[in-house]
Amino acid sequence: MDSTILIKLSGESLANKQKSLAIDYELVRQIGSQLKEIQNLGHKILIVIGGGNFWRGTSAAKNGINRNTADYIGMLGTVMNGLALDSVFRDLGIKTRVLSSMSLDPRICEYFVREKAMKYLEDNNVLIFVGGTGRPFFTTDSAATLFASEMGANIILVGKNNVNGIFDSDPKINPNALRYDKITYNQVIEKNLKVMDSTAFSMARDNKIKLLIFDIKEKNSISKLIKRQIKHTEVY
């Protein structure tokens, strides 16, 4: 098996609120161990990381901070998360490259150039994309579908916090909500179900990228998802 997958991680998935940790390094190590297993199955791995454990641009904008500025602060939060992933993954013996949509000091991380990124990927590096799209008013969901499209990934794993798929109603409110095992892009639109923001969702649909929605908080969920051993929703 030889395919390229992109894993969309929220910043919150790295946090441990009970321990008041913005980044729980034990959780990051668990993610890294799963990546090694996935690489051994022949997959090439891309990661897009959010920054919500540090900052949420939309919330800050509502409290009086200029939306452009708020979003750029959020992008810097993704850089912090990406560097944390990079450090832990390297300690686990995983080859990684942190690539930014924004121009930063090269001592911090590299600016994304597709040709170089493809070479790193061929050399079996896990690529960690930070900085979102590099522009305000776009979410990291949009960054995920953008990088998946550019890098030729055919699957995006969308990790949610304590929600193991797409439901016909909010499972946190309705205990009888039904989870979809599989659903088409058109059905999601017709039923007005929330998966990603509309820009990201449209890009994934147009580029025929399969989405797998799963609970990132479930133990070993990423490696289990690759083997289809946990509950999830497939959007195709």
UniProtKB/Swiss-Prot annotation:
Organism whose genome encodes this protein: Mesomycoplasma hyopneumoniae (strain 7448) (Mycoplasma hyopneumoniae)
Subunit: Homohexamer.
E.C. number(s) listed in UniProt: 2.7.4.22
HAMAP family in the record: PyrH_B
Localization: Cytoplasm
Binding, UMP: 51, 71, 133-140
Protein name as catalogued: Uridylate kinase
Activity regulation description: Inhibited by UTP.
Transport recorded as keyword: no
